[in-house]
């Protein structure tokens, strides 16, 4: 068994915090294992002057790290699972999903402010079509503005007055020790999260049995079932950065509850929930996707 690994990751503060969590878990599971970290700049990190949906939706924060794995520079990659495309290349696999953190979206605004109490016409920043669609449905009076950059940059823009509020993933804020800036946690019946939100996705080369064996102790069955259902939902719809799609799976005993939404940019959307056995999460995800497509989602996707 090898005694060293190199992790590839983006260079943002959040990406490094998540990478160090995986590094520490690996070293706890395998005393004596040396784990190095290589920072890699992705296309999504470079292009900051355009909305994500205007750049493209196939692995904006992933492709360059996968290339480093193919070249043998790194052995595995640590991602926010919500950044992964709906289908991975055949030579890559989602090797590990550790225990999920808070999957909810978070509103960051003036202290005490909630989504319902934001003033008429308030400027709300988000880079997500999924969030924008659901916010338009809830509060059509809001002025939704694109928001790019890392978490620190987004919070700085809010402090400077460029926005009245912004919406970010709660998990990222909590991992960065910034929970105190959250003014409201948005429950899934208000905003359905992104597929994989709150999960760290560890990607490795398919067939790299030695690396996969080292990673195996880090996998969490509940997180694995949830992301399998959510990604099956996303894959059936064909969604990416260009389509407002959200899903959240919750494990209750042997049953998996899956919430999903398909939307349009103007705030029209279809939402639904389906339950099924946790032993077939992919089947549950595909079934809910079919249900929502038939209920009007297909027409929304067609424009």
From Swiss-Prot:
List, separated by semicolons, the cofactors it needs: dipyrromethane
> Which domain of life does the protein's organism represent?
Bacteria
Residue stretches in coiled coil: none
Q: Does the keyword Transferase apply?
A: yes
- Cofactor binding notes: Binds 1 dipyrromethane group covalently.
Q: What class of enzyme is it?
A: transferase
Please give the residue positions where the record annotates the modification S-(dipyrrolylmethanemethyl)cysteine: 241
> Catalytic activity, per the record?
4 porphobilinogen + H2O = hydroxymethylbilane + 4 NH4(+)
Name a GO molecular-function annotation: hydroxymethylbilane synthase activity
EC number, UniProt record: 2.5.1.61
Fill in the subunit field for this protein: Monomer.
Q: What else is known?
A: The porphobilinogen subunits are added to the dipyrromethane group.
Q: What is this protein called?
A: Porphobilinogen deaminase
Query: What gene codes for this chain?
Result: hemC
